Regions:
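Non-catalytic accessory segments of hydrolases
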Residues: 1-133
Length: 133
C-alpha cells in the first residue's frame, strides 16, 4: 500500500513493508544534490525542493567501489554503480511521532556496502520502536 508524507523538500510516496503492513518504507530519498559536473569533488549541496510527488519506492544505485564477488551475494541482483548515489532509505512505524531516530551506516570496507543489501532491511529493527535511516 502506498503512503505519502510531506518533507521539507516536498511530498514523498513510500509504501508499506512487504512483511509488515504497519511499517512504512521510503527508499531512495535524496539527501544531497548528485555530485556530478561542477559539484564533483565538492562538499554536498542541499537537495532542491520538488513540486511533484517524489516516488520513494526503489533503492538507488550504490556508489562506485572496489568489486568484490563475495559481496554480490547480498546485492539483490543489482550490479551497477553510479556517482549519483547520495540517497538514503527510511523504515518507520505508521505512528512515528516522538520516536527516536537511529542512523545506520553500513560497512563493507569500500568493497561491498550499499543501502539495498539484503542484510540491511530495517523492517524488524524499526518495529522495535525507532525510525531507522
Amino acid at each position: 500500500m502506498k503512503t505519502n508524507i510531506e518533507t521539507a523538500q516536498g511530498w514523498v510516496a513510500g509504501e508499506s513493508a512487504a512483511t509488515d503492513p504497519a511499517m512504512r518504507v521510503f527508499r531512495g530519498l535524496p539527501y544531497a544534490q548528485p555530485p556530478l559536473g561542477d559539484l564533483r569533488w565538492k562538499p554536498p549541496q542541499p537537495v532542491e525542493p520538488w513540486t511533484d510527488l517524489h516516488a520513494a519506492d526503489a533503492f538507488s544505485l550504490p556508489c562506485w567501489q572496489t568489486h568484490s564477488e563475495d559481496a554480490f551475494v547480498w546485492s539483490r541482483g543489482v550490479f551497477e554503480r553510479s556517482e549519483d548515489c547520495l540517497y538514503l532509505n527510511v523504515w518507520s512505524p505508521e505512528d512515528a511521532d516522538h520516536l527516536p531516530v537511529m542512523v545506520w551506516f553500513h560497512g563493507g570496507a569500500h568493497t561491498g556496502g550499499w543501502g539495498h543489501n539484503l542484510l540491511f532491511d530495517g523492517t524488524n529493527l524499526a518495529g522495535l520502536g525507532v525510525v531507522l535511516v
